[in-house]
Amino acid sequence: MKALDQLTFDNRFARLGDAFSTQVLPEPIADPRLVIASKSAMALLDLDPAQADTPVFAELFSGHKLWEGADPRAMVYSGHQFGSYNPRLGDGRGLLLAEVVNDAGEHWDLHLKGAGQTPYSRMGDGRAVLRSSIREFLASEALHALGIATSRALCVIGSSTPVWRETRESAAMLTRLAQSHVRFGHFEYFYYTKQPEQQRVLIDHVLEQHYPECREAEQPYLAMFRTIVERNAELIAHWQAYGFCHGVMNTDNMSILGITFDFGPYAFLDDFDANFICNHSDDRGRYSYANQVPIAHWNLSALAQALTTVIEVEPLKEALGLFLPLYQAHYLDLMRRRLGLTTAEDDDMALVERLLQRMQSGGVDYNLFFRRLGDQPVAEALKGVRDDFIDLAGFDAWGADYLARCEREAGNGDGRRERMHAVNPLYVLRNYLAQKAIEAAEAGDYSEVRRLHQVLSTPFEEQAGMQAYAERPPAWGKHLEISCSS
């Protein structure tokens, strides 16, 4: 394992030139102190976890010091926000500090969020608050532990620097890791500003660095777009299967890698509600849980439009047409696993849909239901969850069909509990848990955010003394809507 001064850098995106980013030095925050660090994220850089406890760690990730090989850059991009095109966005408070090459030859972006003003700050102060930084850290690491593709969070550094949002808060910096920070909005920027040469440079960069398997295809650009469609179909299937709501699916928040990116007012479902809106600013429900599938397709079509400079329209349409069937296949596979099914039958989607209808009408806790369904043999498990439902006759009818479905599988009961517990988390990141950790951290106590992170790092395994993190939320904690303010 390495010390901080032993990292190797290869800043490929910075070398693309000033048309793609602007060199900006981070503005340090006062009195930097470590709030939390992820040992598993540090391992991606081959960093010794003990480095997090050194003074230089907080200094490097708060803007006070800079590596000799770093080349901090604010990236330029545009994007569709709530369906309307915004011609010039860019990193308004984040900097791509450097690209680290680990011993396996993997490149990881070090991105500092809350690093101060940039040419793209759009009248903002360039800061991130402790509250939103903790939320992104927890979500990144929780989704990773669930097996959902996501950017990673290395650390959060707190400070005494004041910032004003709805009230006075303290500034913080989050260091995010991803193998690329290129967004759909990067391609839109060069398309709508009519810069075809720069557009092609960017496309070639992404193809070469992130989709090398597509280079030998008959149409490499089309093969790359098709793979992006495939990755997003799988990603959104995981979101829907595990009840994750992103909240701000603007095209500038969509990663070209098909990973969860730019966490804001996100939430996991508590009681199942297909129409749940987690973003307080989304008064029309554009980014509701139910709309995430069509919005992902819409965003991919926006990316496709930006790629019409290098790919014919009809092949792009054909590739876009793959999204929904691929999504449905991935989603159904995940839901079969969550139900403990090991084979496929034609009526399985109808079985899932009928269950969700019963859950919606009864206000049943989404993730907890699946966990409890795997606690016992099928017949006993159905009795155990029955009282959660209001329409008992409707649930009994569904339960009879589910029991019959399980009985048609040879050996379904063998290892059922272990099989279902391996895919149905006991612990999920509920907003009220995050809020309690944030309030403690704002008072200077970081123990709760660290404890919550530890619990969420192994969400499928029961942990001694952590029952409180596996319970239904209190009435005040259900379906919290979160502001975009960060």
Swiss-Prot record:
Q: Where is the active site?
A: 252
| Cofactor(s) this protein requires | Mg(2+); Mn(2+)
* EC number(s) reported in the record: 2.7.7.-, 2.7.7.108
List ligand-binding residues for ATP. Answer: 90, 92-93, 113, 125-126, 176, 183, 262
Catalysed reactions listed for this entry: L-seryl-[protein] + ATP = 3-O-(5'-adenylyl)-L-seryl-[protein] + diphosphate; L-threonyl-[protein] + ATP = 3-O-(5'-adenylyl)-L-threonyl-[protein] + diphosphate; L-tyrosyl-[protein] + ATP = O-(5'-adenylyl)-L-tyrosyl-[protein] + diphosphate; L-histidyl-[protein] + UTP = N(tele)-(5'-uridylyl)-L-histidyl-[protein] + diphosphate
Q: Which domain of life, per UniProt?
A: Bacteria
Tell me which InterPro entries the record gives: SelO
GO molecular-function terms, A-Z: AMPylase activity; ATP binding; magnesium ion binding
Alphabetized UniProt keyword annotations? ATP-binding, Magnesium, Manganese, Metal-binding, Nucleotide-binding, Nucleotidyltransferase, Transferase
User: Which sites bind Mg(2+)?
Assistant: 253, 262
What is the documented function of this protein? Nucleotidyltransferase involved in the post-translational modification of proteins. It can catalyze the addition of adenosine monophosphate (AMP) or uridine monophosphate (UMP) to a protein, resulting in modifications known as AMPylation and UMPylation.
Protein family per UniProt: Belongs to the SELO family.
Protein name as annotated? Protein nucleotidyltransferase YdiU
Q: Which organism is it from?
A: Pseudomonas putida (strain W619)
